[in-house]
Amino acid sequence: MWPQARLPPHPAMAEETRQSKLAAAKRKLKEYWQRNSPGVPAGAKRNRKTNGSIHETATSGGCHSPGDSATGIHGESPTSSATLKDLESPCQELAVVPDSRSVKVSQLKNTIKSLKQQNKQVEHQLEEEKKANNEKQKAERELEVQIQRLNIQKGKLNTDLYHTKRSLRYFEEESKDLAVRLQHSLQRKGELERALSAVTATQKKKAERQFSSRSKARMEWKLEQSMREQALLKAQLTQLKESLKEVQLERDEYAEHLKGERARWQQRMRKMSQEVCSLKKEKKHDKYRVEKLERSLSKLKHQMAEPLPPEPPAVPSEVELQHLRKELERVAGELQAQVEYNQRISLLNEGQKERLREQEERLQEQQERLPEQEERLQQLAEPQNSFKELNNENKSVLQLEQQVKELQEKLGKERLEAASQQKQQLTAQLSLMALPGEGDGGGHLDSEGEEAPRPIPSIPQDLESREAMSGFMDHLEEKADLSELVEKEELGFFQYYRERCHQKVYHPITKPGGSAKDAAPGGGHHQAGPGQGGDEGEAAGAAGDGVAAGGDYKGHSKFLVTAQNPAHEPSPGAPAPQELGAAHKHGDLCEVSLTDSVEPVQGEAREGSPHDNPTAQPIVQDHQEHPGLGSNCCVPFFCWAWLPRRRR
């Protein structure tokens, strides 16, 4: 048996080794023939050499039998009979040789066939490796291109994220600055209010000591100054509100932008999912085609593996072999192309899946950011809610103030009726008690009799003159106390007028073309519409109350001048109808004394106060529990801020 040769690295080298092996086998056959034929002459040896060369050239595909070589020798030299005779004996000897040579030749043929098959397999493997390398290189290039695209998209997304973060930081800083400025303005406002309250307290003390035209001028000047400061504060607050509105508009625009971006990403996700579905369908179709090709390939392999029918020793036709090779190459090429296509589709699917994952992560990040933005929006809406609460409190306070005013008017009427009755009693008593030589005292008594808030018991006519004089002097002392009380009530009225002026500043009339004079006839009795203008009605009512109070102040000053001027005193026995008419005309004096006597700022127990009247005590208590707008002047600004939003 011949030793099996190793697989050559290259087909050209395999061909050379095959030829060298064939030449070596031919040499060994020649040597064997020479050994078995010792009696052959030299000429025959030469002929054998020539025949051997001819035999080498003739047997390019394999080795022939010794009979064939002998026939070839006879065909070449028919003339020489000696050589024929000489060759007959070795041919006969060679015919007697055992069949081992034919067995060796068949073995050599089998080895040659196996080597050819191995050569084909190696060539096929080399082609497959080359194709696989080409596919890998193509896939690597495609992956590099996809990686570059992903890096570019990543850079763009990073820049967008940076810009969004920067804008968010900018908005946060602006909102913080606005909040700090608003806080400072509120602190400044509180300081100014405290300063104003301190100034009013000092002015009150000075007015209690001395009431003159100089103090009035100073008070008016300081009032104007405070009003200017309040106007400046109002302008600053309007600027802050405008900036806050701009920030809110920018916030809304940014929220809309985020919504649009989210819708865009969702649309892109839908497109990508549709593409993935189409790729999956194509992949299924390609799998089906691959299965078909694999079935056909398995059938071909099965057909090739089946034992062929016994053929004649002749070599099969090369045309059939070439046809089979072409079929096999075609099927292998189709299979390889299908495998390449499947690999590309799998790579594309992986890339699409990675993109979908990245987009899902981005959407999750945006969804995580949305609650933070909602919290910020809620934080921005918290001051608006506080404004609404303050607005509601302001409405309730105005309603309570209106109720208190109505009760005060009723109480003032009752007090006026009681005062008129007391005056009638006093005039009757003075006419009975009048003595000669006491006319001046009686005149002075009549001049101050209209301001007596308490009833004096009737004096019997059968008393002695000294007792009547002592009672009369006591009555005069009480009248002097009442005059002091009237001065205190006048100061309280000035303070009430100042608070109403502050309310005018803090409650501006927001209707276009409206003014304080137009709102004055309302007298505080205002009603808000169902949809809008509720705060406007409140502000107009407050301004109307202030104007009405100003008119009452003018009439009350005239009344005080007539009451305190001794030159215009009536005669002792006259009933003083002008004073009664003035008292009825300026009935707000009693109302002012009531409101001033119950204010917690003064805190002084006066004679003739409403605490003496049991019907006025619950009203006073209610007014102390629910003070008016003078105690909290910052509320109307918030009402002013909410008016344009309600109109929307």
From Swiss-Prot:
Gene from which this protein is expressed: GOLGA8G
Similarity annotation: Belongs to the GOLGA8 family.
Region (Disordered): 1-84, 119-139, 356-376, 434-461, 508-549, 600-624
Name the UniProt record assigns to this protein: Golgin subfamily A member 8G
Ranges annotated as biased composition (Polar residues): 50-62
Domain of life: Eukaryota
Biased composition (Basic and acidic residues): 121-139, 441-453
Amino acid composition bias (Pro residues), ranges on this chain: 1-11
Keyword list, A-Z: Coiled coil
Keyword Coiled coil among UniProt keywords: yes
Sequence ranges of Gly residues compositional bias: 521-534
Coiled coil stretches, renumbered: 105-160, 223-275, 318-424
Organism this protein belongs to: Homo sapiens
GO cellular component: cis-Golgi network
